[in-house]
Amino acid sequence: MSTTDHIDTSAPARDLRPAGIAGWAATVMLFTGVILISSTGAPEPNFDAPAADIERYLETQDPWALAVGGFLMAFGLVAWLWFVCGLAAAVRRPGARAEWLSTVVLVSGTAAVAVMLTGATQASAYRGGDGLDPQVAQFAFDLTSVTLANMWVALGSFGLATGWAILAGRGEPGSPGRPAWPAWLGWWALAVGAGYLVVRMAFPSYLWYIPHLLFWVWVLVVSTRMLRVRAATDSTAV
């Protein structure tokens, strides 16, 4: 006789499936958008590249790839918001000592979107074909890089709050309606959150790829568990 693993949540399990779909959609659309925007024209320069390299990169980007990539990234951010809202509800446990952590999860995830919606990551590229002054191009590119780095702070807070909420929730009495998240998901989130804060202090450094890739793999794992969860019952599967 075996039992089915469930997610620790005060919301009905079936309500987490849209959040799981949103997590997958956000990951696919954001990565596809970034790849489309950065893969055309001259190679994407480093954070500390000279102005001439940045100017050539912006001037050689394909306008269609830029438009489609920007569309995918915008809708990917919307899907991310749906995932964040679902996750904040999923880690909330009424009566837990750290019940407020779900609010930090929601606010931190929303702050990451707010930073990206400033448009700094795309505004300079839209004018690249019109010819940019090298200094203006460098300023726009640097603004994009700093915007990305500031997003790491919000994602770091998101990871720390989510990991803490998962681990704190496991210490509360369980029930058939609120089965537990696995502890390793909580520790994974804590490690990624701390990693984001470390690489922000080390900016500019390509070490940011490590927590960033681990973070999005974590998002896919959590999203998959949301999709697989079933409404908890007292019965067991034989």
Specify the residue positions occupied by each region the protein language model found.
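Hydrophobic, aromatic-enriched alpha-helical segments typical of multi-pass transmembrane helices
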Residues: S2-V238
